[in-house]
Design a protein with these regions (language model features):
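Terminal-region recognition feature
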Residues: 1-130
Length: 130
């Protein structure tokens, strides 16, 4: 009887889940926009504050965007994971392309559906043709 009561009150392993959805880039002056370092900073820091967390699960759905913002967000994820000693598991939903895949690479493991669009990190460059 006592052991079953004790099991009931024991804490289960905690996995913190956060979502990173949208185009990666700076927020416009009208307040709309996607993911950037400034608007993901508090979310990520709060996720890593849970001392009992066994892992952080990041659900990603992004076609990519700004290389600079992708790098800053991914670096923050890696830094927090190392500092807090909490592994990050990334789950790619519909799309994790370009910068979205860059974010997923910040995790220890990447999971996706067989139908998810993954990868395709590239750069579009325009020139005057000479």
């Amino acid at each position: 009887m006592i052991s079953s009561v004790r099991k009931f009150f024991q804490r289960k392993p905690l996995v913190v889940v956060i979502r990173l959805d949208g185009v990666i880039g700076a927020v416009s002056r009208f307040g709309s926009g996607g993911l950037d370092d400034s608007n993901t900073q508090k979310l990520l820091e709060k996720a890593f504050e849970f001392e009992k967390a066994k892992a952080i699960a990041i659900k990603i759905n992004s076609p990519g965007g700004s290389p600079t913002q992708s790098s800053l967000i991914a670096s923050r994820i890696l830094k927090l994971s190392e500092e807090k000693k909490i592994p990050v598991l990334c789950f790619c939903e519909d799309v994790a392309a370009s910068g979205g895949y860059w974010l997923a690479c910040a995790g220890k493991e990447i999971y996706s559906d067989i139908n998810s669009i993954i990868g395709s990190i590239g750069v579009i460059s325009a020139s005057f043709g000479f």
